[in-house]
A protein has these predicted regions:
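Acidic/polar low-complexity surface segments
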Residues: 26-41, 62-63
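C-terminal segments of enzyme domains that contribute to small-molecule binding surfaces
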Residues: 39-56, 64-80, 92-101, 107-112, ...
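Extracellular beta-strand-rich solenoid/capping regions of secreted or surface-exposed proteins
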Residues: 9-11, 41
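Divalent-metal (often Zn2+) His-rich catalytic cores of metallo-beta-lactamase-fold enzymes
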Residues: 145
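Short, small-residue-biased leader/transition segments that mark boundaries at the very start
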Residues: 1-6
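A short, glycine- and basic residue-enriched loop/turn
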Residues: 12, 33, 66-67, 84-85, ...
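A contiguous pocket-lining binding segment that forms or flanks enzyme active sites
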Residues: 110-141
Length: 198
């Protein structure tokens, strides 16, 4: 069972096992989307996810569509997950971070406080987004992105280590990062170099 105290749960919402939901969270209520016309849609929360005070997670827009938050996530106070977002497993959203509609956050992502993620943006697995970042384009896996607008500033070495990624793989990722972001090569040339070196 999950612990839910003085929070609002909308219809067609599923809460996984051993979740903790703190006061004044709103989960599965109607989306803040002018396209929504009252259709039956869903909000699904995985197991062992912690949802802190004043978090809002909207259900989806579109008949039969869903908003989903995975297992073992931590959504700190005042975070927002908009309609049709898909949040993977082991994701941390720091205080007041917000996902606009249809955003995708893959596994083991950390999003800093007050960061804003634009609609339809995808953040790749094991990435880290800095606090107050304005994310308007997709963020590749394994990197750190920060700024307004956010740009890739480095490899998320600490996150990769914590995720149990082997040292050999981390070394290859570091080399690939240098080729893509630091060499000055065009993308096609960078791909050629990686095929030669890795």
């Amino acid at each position: 069972s999950s612990d839910v105290c003085s929070s609002d749960l909308g219809g067609w919402t599923t809460i996984g096992k051993r979740c903790e939901i703190y006061p004044n969270a709103s989960i599965g209520l109607e989306p803040q989307d002018l396209k929504f016309k009252g259709e039956k849609s869903y909000c699904n929360i995985g197991d062992e996810t912690v949802i802190r005070e004043f978090v809002t997670i909207s259900r989806a827009t579109g008949e039969g569509e869903e908003t989903r938050v995975g297992n073992n996530c931590l959504l700190q106070a005042c975070t927002h997950v908009a309609h049709n977002c898909i949040v993977g497993n082991n994701v941390i959203m720091s205080n007041c971070a917000g996902l606009a509609g249809h955003a995708i956050v893959e596994d083991r992502v950390v999003i800093g406080g007050l960061a804003g993620i634009h609609q339809f943006v995808k953040i790749g697995r094991n990435a880290m987004v800095g606090g107050m970042a304005k994310v308007v384009q997709d963020i590749p896996p394994y990197v750190i992105a920060d700024g307004q607008p956010a740009r890739v500033i480095g490899l998320n070495s600490v996150g990769l280590s914590r995720a149990g990624i082997s040292e050999d793989v981390r070394r290859d990722l570091k080399q690939a990062f240098r080729i893509i972001y630091r060499s000055g090569f065009s993308l096609s040339k960078a791909i050629e170099e990686m095929e030669l070196q890795l």
